[in-house]
């Protein structure tokens, strides 16, 4: 899990994620009413209007999904697209929305574990580490 706000995000890992040849999955999480002008990526920031932030999150999501037009001549301007990214948009970060996110990730862990034939409720790896530690 990592993240950043503003131009630091744009010019570091967002560019790497968009143009990387590596495959990844990711989640974009947007809280539109917890805006702080100190960390805003827009020059004409309006604290009372969260439309710009929502539109920016949607545009990043679509860029990951669709990529750029394949007719672009320069290779370094091409963005591949077809990257599996989910977009979660919330009005505010509070106890309820944080609980929703935790529930989503717990369900995702359980679902993926069932496909890998793993019981996510046992701790054999943890117990093995404890046994090895006792023998050192």
Language model features by range: what are they?
Residues 1-136:
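A SIS-like phosphosugar-recognition module
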């Amino acid at each position: 899990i990592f993240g950043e706000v503003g131009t630091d995000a744009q010019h570091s890992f967002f560019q790497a994620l968009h143009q990387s040849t590596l495959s990844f999955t990711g989640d974009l999480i947007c809280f539109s009413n917890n805006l702080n002008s100190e960390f805003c990526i827009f020059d004409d920031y309006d604290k009372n209007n969260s439309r710009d932030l929502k539109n920016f999150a949607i545009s990043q999501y679509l860029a990951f999904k669709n990529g750029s037009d394949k007719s672009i001549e320069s290779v370094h301007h091409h963005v591949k697209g077809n990257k599996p990214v989910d977009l979660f948009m919330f009005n505010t970060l509070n106890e309820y929305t944080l609980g929703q996110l935790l529930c989503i990730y717990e369900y995702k862990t359980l679902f993926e574990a069932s496909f890998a034939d793993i019981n996510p409720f046992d701790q054999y790896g943890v117990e093995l580490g404890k046994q090895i530690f006792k023998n050192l």
